[in-house]
Amino acid sequence: MFLVDWFYGILATLGLWQKEAKILFLGLDNAGKTTLLHMLKDERLVQHQPTQYPTSEELSIGKIKFKAFDLGGHQIARRVWKDYYAKVDAVVYLVDSFDKERFAESKKELDALLSGWSSLAHCFLFLDNWVTRIEHPICCLRKMNWRYHMGANGASPLARGKVNLADSNVRPVEVFMCSIVRQMGYGEGFRWMSQYIK
């Protein structure tokens, strides 16, 4: 089996074989998870009803084929988040920047999610979904404010920057500003995430 895995790994590295990964879309209700999933799948911007039951979609981004799980963000759905996140390669956590009143609630859910860090996915991609146009100076301020509220600055066991998964129990994390409506920013986040997909 080692030889087969090695061979397919070489093909994937050379771009001759498509990688496969499971990712989990999490965040409070109305953060944009289902909208992002459908934008990635077929580039359709449609207003969705709140996700009541877990759904999954298959999509390709670059040379990676993803099976994406959208569990919903309402209080009942949050109870099953931990049942899924140990079985995926990456977690995409969305926050609606416009809804500042819910930052504390989102942080509480994030803290609960990260409490079982030993079984975390390989990486965490945080997307700060801002509906309006992204402009650099404002973007930086929002990013710092978001990290403050979310506790994403130096939070162990997560680390920003390039992380070698083989040498550490630390999981890579990065925050990207995005606007799903304007189709901006999230592509960079998924490119960052793809480097950690085996």
From Swiss-Prot:
It catalyses: GTP + H2O = GDP + phosphate + H(+). The keyword Protein transport applies. Pfam families: Arf (PF00025). Keywords: Cytoplasm, Endoplasmic reticulum, ER-Golgi transport, Golgi apparatus, GTP-binding, Hydrolase, Magnesium, Membrane, Metal-binding, Nucleotide-binding, Protein transport, Transport. Its main location: endoplasmic reticulum. It comes from the Eukaryota. It is found in: Endoplasmic reticulum membrane; Golgi apparatus, Golgi stack membrane; Cytoplasm, Cytosol. GTP binds at residues 30, 32-35, 129, 180. GO terms for cellular component: COPII vesicle coat; cytosol; endoplasmic reticulum exit site; endoplasmic reticulum membrane; Golgi cisterna membrane. GO terms for molecular function: GTP binding; GTPase activity; metal ion binding. It is a peripheral membrane protein. InterPro entries: P-loop_NTPase (IPR027417), Small_GTPase_ARF/SAR (IPR006689), Small_GTPase_SAR1 (IPR006687). One of its GO terms (biological process) is intracellular protein transport. Its EC number is 3.6.5.2. A motif (STAR) lies at residues 2-4. GDP binds at residues 30-35, 129, 180. Mg(2+) binds at residues 29, 70. Residues 10-14 are annotated as: Mediates recruitment to ER membranes. The keyword ATP-binding does not apply. Small GTPases activation is mediated by guanine exchange factors (GEF), while inactivation through hydrolysis of the bound GTP is stimulated by GTPase activating proteins (GAP). Small GTPase that cycles between an active GTP-bound and an inactive GDP-bound state and mainly functions in vesicle-mediated endoplasmic reticulum (ER) to Golgi transport. The active GTP-bound form inserts into the endoplasmic reticulum membrane where it recruits the remainder of the coat protein complex II/COPII. The coat protein complex II assembling and polymerizing on endoplasmic reticulum membrane is responsible for both the sorting of cargos and the deformation and budding of membranes into vesicles destined to the Golgi. Belongs to the small GTPase superfamily. SAR1 family. Homodimer; upon association with membrane. Part of the coat protein complex II/COPII, composed of SEC23/24 and SEC13/31 heterodimers, that it helps recruit and assemble on endoplasmic reticulum (ER) membranes at ER exit sites. This is Small COPII coat GTPase SAR1.
